[in-house]
Amino acid sequence: MPIKSRIRSIPDYPKKGIMFRDITTLIKDPVGFRLVIDHLTQHYLEAGMDFDVIVGIEARGFIIGGALSYTLGKGFVPVRKPGKLPADVVSQEYELEYGSDKIEIHTDALVEGQRVLLVDDLLATGGTALAAAALVEKVGGIVAEMAFIVNLPDVGGERKLLEKGYNVYSLTDFEGD
């Protein structure tokens, strides 16, 4: 599947020493976007994984998670940056590859025991994914799996998530480049 070749690499963004993997070139291409959603849909249908809802991490996790929610017939729950959700929220701070941030989820976003597929575009340090998983768990959900378009194995996020007991699935890896 030619997904990797559709992802643009931008050196020294957002700061020097970071190689940014830009999926906008992938998702603006209707064939590339369809490949991503079709592949993920097929993977989860064939795996028979038991989950109730998809949680997408702002912002690119909304794009993939929303489309995947539609194709799989699942609800969608957003994890957002602070101040973007209108009702009561819980927050989680986290470290990322180039700084720190905070994310939030509505306190009533999930029903106790709901199984969640957590979706984002890219896995680097695992900080964002761990923070989102903590939010899911704070509001009563269970993370069934985490799905990403891009994994950067050299940065160590996948290893960190696996060590914490999370299942991880990604479409493509950028190793050593």
Curated annotation (Swiss-Prot):
It comes from Chlorobium chlorochromatii (strain CaD3). It is found in: Cytoplasm. GO terms for cellular component: cytoplasm. Its EC number is 2.4.2.7. SUPFAM superfamilies: PRTase-like (SSF53271). GO terms for biological process: adenine salvage; AMP salvage; purine ribonucleoside salvage. CDD domains: PRTases_typeI. Pathway: Purine metabolism; AMP biosynthesis via salvage pathway; AMP from adenine: step 1/1. Keywords: Cytoplasm, Glycosyltransferase, Purine salvage, Transferase. This is Adenine phosphoribosyltransferase. Homodimer. Coiled coil: none annotated. The lineage of its organism: Bacteria, Pseudomonadati, Chlorobiota, Chlorobiia, Chlorobiales. It is an enzyme of class 2 (transferase). Signal peptide: none annotated. One of its GO terms (molecular function) is AMP binding. PANTHER family: ADENINE PHOSPHORIBOSYLTRANSFERASE (PTHR32315:SF3). Catalyzes a salvage reaction resulting in the formation of AMP, that is energically less costly than de novo synthesis. Belongs to the purine/pyrimidine phosphoribosyltransferase family. The keyword Transferase applies. It catalyses: AMP + diphosphate = 5-phospho-alpha-D-ribose 1-diphosphate + adenine.
